Curated annotation (Swiss-Prot):
Protein name: Butyrate--CoA ligase AAE11, peroxisomal
Record lineage: Eukaryota, Viridiplantae, Streptophyta, Embryophyta, Tracheophyta
InterPro entries: AMP-bd_C, AMP-bd_C_sf, AMP-dep_synth/lig_dom, ANL_N_sf
GO cellular component: peroxisome
Domain of life: Eukaryota
Species: Arabidopsis thaliana (Mouse-ear cress)
Length: 572
């Protein structure tokens, strides 16, 4: 059989952009997007994406060019997950929580030709563009403003606007034919940044094949069914909305887009549109629980929720499910192109007491259908740990859905893929039934509201402060976000009590990094605990931090039901 060959008929590259064309042909009467009063069908969304792709081609966007976007969960953000890769270009969704300096670092590193900006972030981008020349002399990306669909607001001077590109786009027969013909399924489809706060940010390059496989595995692992109504509470900028941007199209579902995610908005849209699915981190559960009683109306059928990040406490899962939600726990990371583990329900669990069922739901689960393998290995011997639910090791994975690597960072790519696995840096166990459960994060990661914060990055900023001699940052409990940074600092001799206070350092951090990364507490020590090799013992500092409490006014718990949470995303 070796003489059989691959040809154009039996070797078509895998890409999720084909889901869009299929949806337009198979579900012509299904609503694809709901956004306020705006409604689109799948044929209309297909037409809009084709027109935008044609306009991008007319602007000389070609294969492997980067096109960035800074926008909330609005229709444009969804459409660009198809229209940009239809041209062969690479989509770069940017975290809307970041400050101007961090976004400038990302743009310098990604070098996009075009930057789409939602009107809400136009002032921020003006500041970003002023910062870019201080890093290197490179042309600014062309700015294209995204207004509301029915807006009459004028774009930036001499620049185009998003809806204008769609109106002007005229796909030709040749361009239309090429839009769905990916050159190679290993070509990049998206560039997602795990961190943009250092001089060496990690831009994760995702392939068409990886996105295709991840989207399908989510459909199967989450049991999405046909025609899901998906509420966008998870930011699309985070790992392409865990690839649900493509999954919903594959099932001919409906995307319910909301600009600002609050508890009242969630409940309102669930009731208005019959939402069946949504994704979020456990932090969002607290918003839902603390919403007004009038918002928490009974659901005609359970809303399926896929959650990730820190493991939600059993009591939290129980309370959320009493509101009409059914929770499935998952695990993934940007480097894995979204979820790779799902806590799939087993029939025998139905016979267990409720508290045992919820305890089982807390686990991260078993590998998805398209992941080749997952294991937990001893970090020293590299041997698999016993499946006893007690012996901890590093979670490692392998499969065709994983990232291609880190952009312009071969050293980090090699380190991530050493020993033939993707090394997640997360510590966990495997239970006798094969289910994986995370027990700890790698030492320098703090999980705050689902966002990954590197303690090393926070420490770098603290060390920039003139009076700081030593600094170590660990996680401390936070009543709203789960964890938040806590800094332990040693001041230079003779500086104690003179000019530097806890407030001074917190203020300095807020001026030099994204606010969500800033320490909520600073503890001054005469000397930090160290081992015999002079290494700071963060384990001891974590024990101290566990006893610390964030003040209620810092937590914002009294206003939690009003606070916008669209920025909450997760390393699953």
């Amino acid at each position: 059989m070796d003489n059989l060959v691959l040809c154009e008929a039996n070797n078509v590259p895998l890409t999720p952009i084909t889901f869009l064309k299929r949806a337009s042909e198979c579900y012509p009467n299904r609503t694809s997007i709901i956004y306020g009063q705006t409604r689109f069908t799948w044929p209309q969304t297909y037409d809009r994406c084709c027109r935008l792709a044609a306009s991008l081609l007319s602007l000389n966007i070609t294969r492997n060019d980067v096109v960035s976007i800074l926008a909330p969960n609005v229709p444009a953000m969804y459409e660009m997950h198809f229209s940009v890769p239809m041209t062969g270009a690479v989509l770069n969704p940017i975290n809307t929580r970041l400050d101007a300096k961090t976004i400038a670092i990302i743009l310098r590193h990604a070098e996009p030709k075009i930057l789409f900006v939602d009107y809400e972030f136009a002032p921020l981008i003006q500041e970003v563009l002023r910062l870019i020349p201080t890093y290197q002399s490179q042309p600014h990306p062309r700015i294209i403003l995204i207004n509301e669909i029915d807006s009459t607001t004028k774009p930036f001077s001499k620049e185009l606007d998003y809806e204008g590109l769609i109106r002007k786009g005229e796909p030709t027969p040749s361009s239309s034919a090429s839009m769905f013909r990916v050159h190679n399924e290993h070509d990049p489809i998206s560039l997602n940044y795990t961190s943009g706060t250092t001089a060496d940010p990690k831009g994760v390059v995702i392939s068409h094949q990886g996105a295709y496989l991840s989207a399908l595995s989510s459909i199967i692992g989450w049991e999405m069914g046909i025609f899901p109504v998906y509420l966008w509470t998870l930011p699309m900028f985070h790992c392409n909305g865990w690839t649900h941007t493509w999954s919903v199209a594959a099932r001919g579902g409906t995307n319910v887009c909301i600009r600002h995610v609050t508890a009242p908005e969630i409940y309102k849209n669930i009731e208005l549109h019959g939402v069946t699915h949504m994704s979020c981190v456990p932090t969002v559960f607290r918003f839902l629980l603390e919403g007004s009683r009038t918002d928490q109306s009974p659901k005609s059928s359970p809303v399926q929720v896929l959650t990730g990040g820190s493991s939600p406490p059993a009591v939290l899962i129980k309370k959320v499910e009493q509101l009409g939600f059914h929770v499935m726990h998952g695990y993934g990371l940007t480097e894995a192109t979204g979820p790779v583990l799902f806590c799939e329900w087993q029939d025998e669990w139905n016979k267990l007491p409720e508290h045992q069922q919820i305890e089982l739901q807390q686990r991260q689960g078993v590998r998805n259908l398209t992941l080749a393998d997952v294991d937990v290995k001893n970090t020293k011997t590299l041997e698999s740990v016993p499946r006893d639910g007690k012996t901890m090791g590093e979670i490692v994975i392998k499969g065709s859905s994983l990232m291609k690597g880190y952009l312009k960072n071969p050293k980090a790519t090699s380190e991530a893929f050493k020993h033939g696995w993707l090394n997640t840096g997360d510590i966990g166990v495997i239970h006798p039934d094969g289910y994986v459960e995370i027990k700890d994060r790698s030492k320098d990661i703090i999980i705050s509201g689902g966002e990954n914060i590197s303690s090393i990055e926070v420490e770098k900023v603290l060390y920039m402060y003139q009076e700081v001699l030593e600094a170590a940052v660990v996680a401390m409990p936070h009543p709203l976000w789960g964890e938040t940074p806590c800094a332990f600092v040693v001041l230079k001799k003779g500086e104690e009590g003179l000019v530097t206070s806890e407030g001074d350092l917190i203020k300095y951090c807020r001026e030099n990094m994204p606010h969500f990364m800033c320490p909520k507490k600073v503890v001054f020590f005469q000397e930090l605990p160290k081992n015999s090799n002079g290494k700071i013992l963060k384990s001891k500092l974590r024990d101290i931090a566990k006893a610390l409490v964030v003040r209620e006014d810092d937590a914002g718990s009294k206003k939690v039901h009003q606070r916008s949470i669209e920025h909450v995303s997760s390393r699953l």
